[in-house]
Amino acid sequence: MGLALILTFTVGACSRNATPAPAKPHVFVIVMENKTVEQALQGPFTASLASTYRVAANYSGVGYPSLPNYLALTSGQTFGIRNDNYYVLPAGGIGAQLTATGVTWRAYMEGMAHGGCLENTYPYVTHHNPFAYYGGKCPSNVVPFTDLAADLKGNTPMFGWITPDVCHDQHDCSVSVGDAWLRQTVGMITESKAWTSNGLLFIVWDEDDGSTENRVLSMVISPGKSHKVSKQGYTHYSLLATIEDTLGVGRLGQAAGAKAMTDLTAN
């Protein structure tokens, strides 16, 4: 009888003292285009983010032109592609991975009409939408950018990928135009409960202006994290590894051997 009481008390005490596992943060990614670090920082809003939050100061793209970088960010490999043509690649990538593991996600494509992800209708271009390549079609998770505002006010997915159109991403238009778009879009995200509840926003440029170093600006925007600059060598594979680790899924492709950006995501 006495032993039973002791066991009951012990189990009850352990149950009361158990600390629940912390909830996974919402993760957002915005991919900008074709600027060196110095060029990107000419945007006053971008510069203010870099001086307030966290920056990977030794971050590089994985190749040229755009498409290999987008594939690296979403699958951990480039498939040997060195152009922006359309290919039907094996089904997979982070989207399929998240779906298989029950993690909600959406990819927001600015300029894309509903159901038209394979059609290049300016200012939307397919080669800035990596999800269109895996399996030769877009899953229903790929939606127009205009859906983002409502999602941020309602049922926000755990992972949100955002591709601006080719003007707002600074590919075809000036740094100032893209910087103004970032001000509006980042403001919308950082006002949401998904971000204020320990969310993570990564802003990265896919490649530089064609130099041999291919160093690009990569920033981590998260509430409650003080300014920090990391000199660790990172690439798009590092960012993919960081996203996958944060969301609790396995690492794809070359992300498996990459160093995660934990010095920038930890408190």
Task: Report each predicted region and the residues it spans.
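Sec-dependent N-terminal signal peptides
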Residues: 1-6
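C-terminal motif of bacterial Sec signal peptides marking the signal peptidase cleavage site
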Residues: 11-13
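Flexible, surface-exposed loop/gating regions in the mature catalytic domains
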Residues: 18-267
